[in-house]
């Protein structure tokens, strides 16, 4: 049983790493965007290939906005905030940059912790901001390092209420792997969230043409079909007659990963 994270935050990990064995005990909250990816268009890594200053600037700007808004709306019950990056050089520069915009008092008040995934093992925060520090000029070895399953799993499951990803490369241009799959999952969530807030919302928004074809085939047989339903921490592709779950796998190749607790 999992009590920490809202369903969208834990769903990817539950499916990719745990085979759906986790039972998520928290209910979804659609009042606020839970997952987000910020692509930094001018981001690039410097000489050591792991420090990305434009990405740090974008993250620190967003951090400051979060703190200012929280101080205005919720001064007596501040949110806790964590900042994660896979790379030590990025972490050290983040510490320097954050200290320039937030006082020591504010950092303590919001329990701001900055570190690698190792730092956050067994820990959690209300909001997590993750700097993947990956850009068009990054070395391929960097991607191999940041996609180590155990550490990747820790990085994406520390947030209780919100997880914001920062990356300096279009996720669609990433090589096949965990990071691309994960950011694709986040994009699907963002698209569905945006539609749910628009006047043109249609609950039957499909991930791909195959899923739509399967859903229509069941409707033609007289069944009621709903798409993208959160069930115990898993996002079911299709639910038929509120009784049966259909997973439309095989349309997009994904590498299965196993991770230990």
Per-range role (PLM):
Residues 1-18:
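ASCE P-loop NTPase helicase motor core
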Residues 32-35, 110, 124-127, 159-163:
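Short glycine-/polar-rich loops that comprise or flank the Walker A/P-loop
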Residues 82, 99-116, 224-228:
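Conserved RecA-like helicase motor-core motifs
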Residues 14, 27, 137-229, 237:
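Helicase C-terminal subdomain and adjacent C-terminal extension
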Residues 236-261:
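Short beta-strand-loop-alpha-helix junction that forms the active-site gateway
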Residues 115, 123-135, 154, 163-164:
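A short beta-strand element within the Helicase C-terminal
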Residues 20-99:
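Conserved helicase/translocase motor-coupling segment
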Residues 85-89, 114-120:
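Conserved helicase motor
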